Every structure is written in C-alpha cells, then in structure tokens.
Amino acid sequence: MFVFASSVTKPDVYAACAEPGIRRVAEDDSLVWALENPGTLFEGYNQLLDRAAEVEGLEGLVLLHHDTEIVSDDFMAHVRAALSDPDVGVVGCVGAVGVRTVAWWDGSVTLASFLHRYDEHGGGDLPGSSWIWDEAPASARFGEVDTVDGFLLVLSPWVVQNIRFDESLGQLHGYDFDFCLQVREAGRKVVTADVRAIHNHSLDLVSNPETWINAHIKIAEKWDGRMPGVGWSAGSWEQRARRAEAERDLFLARAASNELRVHAEIPSLERAITEARTSVSWRVTKPLRALQRLGGGGR
C-alpha cells in the first residue's frame, strides 16, 4: 500500500494541481492525506511521516507539494521498481551529484524530468532538461544521486520509520537536501526514477533571502565533517565566510530566476506582436506606414 500526502497551505492549488495527479496514479488501496495549515513545511511533513509510520503494510510514502501534479501514468510501476532495492531510501524525478550546499543546482544535474509551469507574463511552461527524454543531454541518467528536489519525494518504509525533517533549520529552504543527507548518512541511497511531474510555481526561486541564507548556514554547520564535500570551501569556517558563501548562492539563484523570467517573457511578447500585426488598426494604417517609408526615403 502507498500513501500520498501533501502539506497544504492553499487548498485551491492542491485541488487544481496535486489532487488530479494523485487520482491519476493512485491504486484502489492507496491512502490520500491533505494536511491543511500544518505550520512550517518541516512540521507538516513530520506529522505526515508519524502518521504513515503507523500504516500496516506500507510500501512507500509519496510526499508532494500542493502545487505538484504527477503526470506519469506508470508512476507506481517505476517507484515500486526503485524501492525494490532495499538500500533505496528516497526516490525523486529531479536529482544532482556533486552537491555541497542547499543550492543543489550548482552540482551536476543528472535528471530533471519535470515541467516548470508559471503564471507570470501570461503564463507558460519551462521544461526540465530531461522532460522530453529524446531531447535530453547525454549526461542524463536514472540512478543514485546526492539529493533530489523536494517537490516530489517517494520514501521507503525504513525511511518513514527512522528519518525526520530537521525542524531547527527554518521554515522551508534546504529541507530536501538535509533530509537526503540524513538518509545517505544512515547508509541508504537517494535515487532518481523515470517519473515525471509538473511543478506549478512562481519564477521567483528565492522569495525570502534571509531565510535562504539562514538555512544555508545552518546546514553547512550541521554537516561540517559529517559528509565528505558538503559545506566545504577554501578558508576558515568563520561566520563571515559562511554568510558570504550563502549570499553568493543567493545571487546565483536570483540570476537563475531572472533567466527564467527572460525566457518566460519571450512567448508573451511574441503573442503581443502577433496580435498587433493582425489587428484591424494595423491593417487600416498599413497604407499610411507605406507612405511614411516612401517619404522618409525621398528626403
């Protein structure tokens, strides 16, 4: 039996995004939980973990953001196959290796089988690098990674019983990276699988810079010396150096967000140009524009 669970702060978004995806893939005996007003994401997910730990015959817990829609019809077959390895603790659809901070995208992304759907600039979609597998880069692969993106997590029964989100880290940022580090430290694997999802999310990747910086620092301090490569950088471990590194990653995240916005604006601008050029006023004034061009060329 699988449990599907979300920590819900916007019920209308859950109904529009997560719920249809769950209905698409859930089995007859699956349990579906929507925990409303959970406090922080850490707290909400821990409540769901505690509840799932009491389910007899649990095969796996699917944790998904309320704005995430599962779109793989064969989702259950792929997560079952991944969890058939008793050493696997976490399964996701976006993952990276060489990750040492909460800015996991600074590592080498090995799989990004998701679609980023946004509302800004008239709305649009930005596909991840392996959303369309035939167009994926040669480096794309399924399998073991350092961390997965937390908008979709599938957890093994062992993880449900033994690992919890660290509520001391803050309210949102870094929860997935820290959780994956805990799972790996316990000797289990974090992997990606051939499943796809749509993440309905703003183009703003870091909405609260201070909470980002604090989570970055806390996770670096927590894992210093515990996991090779995590939090490491040249120089001392003074607070100033930690904060400087956190601010650097923050600005990189903002730059990535700006790049997303630029790509998102292009279709909107193209639509506006097309609408203008096919409008009645554009057609009516076409002779006048032609005369103006002739007049300008004769001067």
What are these regions (language model features)?
Residues R188-T211, K218-K222, G235-E238:
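Active-site donor/metal-binding and catalytic loop motifs
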Residues E120-L155:
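A recurrent flexible, glycine/aromatic-enriched loop bordering the glycosyltransferase active site
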Residues N46-G60:
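Active-site nucleotide-sugar/metal-binding loop of Leloir-type enzymes
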Residues W232-R299:
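Boundary detector for helix-to-coil junctions that initiate low-complexity/charged tails
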Residues T147-G150, P157, Q161-I198:
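Donor nucleotide-sugar recognition loop
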Residues P38, E69, D73-R117:
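Conserved donor NDP-sugar-binding/catalytic core segment of glycosyltransferases
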Residues L58-E69:
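Short beta-strand-to-loop acidic/aromatic patch adjacent to the donor-nucleotide binding site
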Residues M1-R24, V32-L35:
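N-proximal low-complexity "stem/linker" segments adjacent to membrane-targeting elements
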